[in-house]
């Protein structure tokens, strides 16, 4: 079948979780990450993801994932990424992008800025809109990794609920979507 592609594959953690029945390809800029993938027998390419995608034929990939990558892209690069995903995915193909959730004030104000290569936070509503605008279907936002409940306020009031949502809510989110059928 068609390959599953992981952009920003790191040391291959996600590639190793994908079914071996599929061809799995990791793309990463970091040579040490690519070497770590090779040492595990994983196929990985050291290349800019946009360049790699541009070299692929239309409708040639089953799914594209990118965990904690899109926050490193300019708006123009994110647009190009979505355009290339739309082009190379086979009909019904899937994208999965995970990124820090700026709805969580702690994540947005502190954790996001611990990585100087993060360009800007991407609110879930914006990402959902852009993915839909680019023609993807079945677009869903999945809020992930809430701060442990023991850190939340210990009272039942509207103020506590709102504070919990803003400070202790999901630290990340994923957007999933499918390319339409022909």
Name these PLM-found stretches:
Residues 129, 139-182:
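A C-terminal cap/extension of S-adenosyl-L-methionine-dependent methyltransferases
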Residues 65:
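A conserved beta-strand element that flanks and buttresses the S-adenosyl-L-methionine
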Residues 11-52:
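Class I SAM-dependent methyltransferase SAM/SAH-binding core
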Residues 97-118:
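Short, glycine-/aromatic-enriched active-site segment of Class I SAM-dependent methyltransferases
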Residues 119-135:
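Short alpha-helix
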Residues 2-8:
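Conserved class I S-adenosyl-L-methionine
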Residues 79-91:
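A short glycine-rich, Lys/Arg-flanked "PGG" loop and its adjoining helix->strand segment in the class I
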Residues 68-72:
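Short catalytic micro-motifs in class I SAM-dependent methyltransferases
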């Amino acid at each position: 079948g068609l390959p599953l592609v992981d952009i920003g594959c790191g040391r291959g953690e996600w590639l190793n979780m994908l079914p071996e029945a599929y061809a799995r390809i990791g793309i990463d800029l970091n040579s040490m990450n690519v070497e770590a993938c090779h040492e595990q027998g994983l196929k990985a390419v050291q290349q800019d993801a946009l360049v790699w995608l541009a070299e692929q034929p239309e409708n040639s990939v089953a799914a594209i994932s990118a965990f904690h990558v899109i926050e490193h892209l300019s708006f123009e690069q994110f647009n190009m990424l979505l355009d290339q995903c739309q082009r190379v995915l086979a009909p019904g193909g899937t994208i999965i992008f995970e990124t820090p959730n700026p709805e969580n004030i702690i994540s947005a104000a502190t954790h996001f800025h611990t990585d100087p290569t993060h360009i800007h936070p991407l609110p879930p509503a914006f990402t959902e809109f852009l993915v839909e605008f680019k023609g993807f279907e079945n677009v869903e936002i999945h809020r992930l990794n809430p701060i442990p409940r023991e850190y939340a306020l210990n009272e039942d009031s509207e103020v506590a609920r709102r504070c919990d949502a803003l400070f202790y809510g999901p630290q990340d989110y994923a957007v999933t979507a499918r390319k339409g059928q022909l």
